Amino acid sequence: YINYKNMLHQHMLTLFNLLPVGSNISTWWNFGSMLLICLMIQTTTGFFLAIHYTANINLAFSSIMHISRDVPYGWIMQNTHAIGASLFFICIYTHIARGIYYGSYLNKEVWLSGTTLLIILMATAFFGYVLPWGQMSFWAATVITNLLTAIPYLGNTLTTWLWGGFAINDPTLTRFFALHFILPFAIISLSSIHILLLHNEGSNNPLGTNSDID
């Protein structure tokens, strides 16, 4: 008689206990991997949502309702995409907090690429927030884009260019959808560079112990 359940249990213990990671790396180092999982979830669900979405001010909200009600498993995709965005930010802020606490900012290339990733992620989230074109979407698009007018000399020109006119309208929504679709690919590319730069020197050692003894 072979106890497969016990074998599986032993295999799982071996898998999680004998990972090639030093004892000087704590649970806080999991959040980088979790961010990659979030990125995969958001890209996948976002692609399927984009198939059914209509970037038109008269049809955008209706297309969201259509996804929720008529598209098979559309409600799961929409909710996963929305909740996944919140989870993304929880993970990234925890990831940053760990970096600040343990002094990861001393690795300048990795830190600067990570800072750039955060800025692009915030921009992507903002563009996505506007897409349903409800009251809050319109308010957010108006208020946030108006901040560009504070830029000396170029402010008004940049705002008009982003709006596609002298007020927020259909061209604005089309541009925001295009930007929301393309920026995740910039995030994927920069994430690859971020990981390559990290593996170039290795992660920091908060406990200062020699991991070779493990």
Curated annotation (Swiss-Prot):
Gene3D superfamilies linked to this entry: Cytochrome Bc1 Complex, Chain C
Keywords on record: Electron transport, Heme, Iron, Membrane, Metal-binding, Mitochondrion, Mitochondrion inner membrane, Respiratory chain, Transmembrane, Transmembrane helix, Transport, Ubiquinone
GO biological process: mitochondrial electron transport, ubiquinol to cytochrome c
GO MF annotations, alphabetized: metal ion binding; ubiquinol-cytochrome-c reductase activity
Entry superkingdom: Eukaryota
Annotated compartments: Mitochondrion inner membrane
Positions of transmembrane segments: 31-51, 75-96, 111-131, 176-196
Cofactor requirement: heme b
GO cellular component, one term: mitochondrial inner membrane
InterPro entries, alphabetized: Cyt_b/b6_N, Cytb/b6-like_sf, Cytochrome_b_N_euk/bac, Di-haem_cyt_TM
Keyword Electron transport in annotation: yes
Record has tRNA processing as a keyword: no
PROSITE patterns, per the entry: CYTB_NTER
Membrane topology: Multi-pass membrane protein
Pfam families named in the record: Cytochrome_B
Function (record text): Component of the ubiquinol-cytochrome c reductase complex (complex III or cytochrome b-c1 complex) that is part of the mitochondrial respiratory chain. The b-c1 complex mediates electron transfer from ubiquinol to cytochrome c. Contributes to the generation of a proton gradient across the mitochondrial membrane that is then used for ATP synthesis.
Family label: Belongs to the cytochrome b family.
Quaternary organization: The cytochrome bc1 complex contains 3 respiratory subunits (MT-CYB, CYC1 and UQCRFS1), 2 core proteins (UQCRC1 and UQCRC2) and probably 6 low-molecular weight proteins.
Protein's recorded name: Cytochrome b
Organism: Lachesis muta muta
Lineage: Eukaryota, Metazoa, Chordata, Craniata, Vertebrata
Gene: MT-CYB
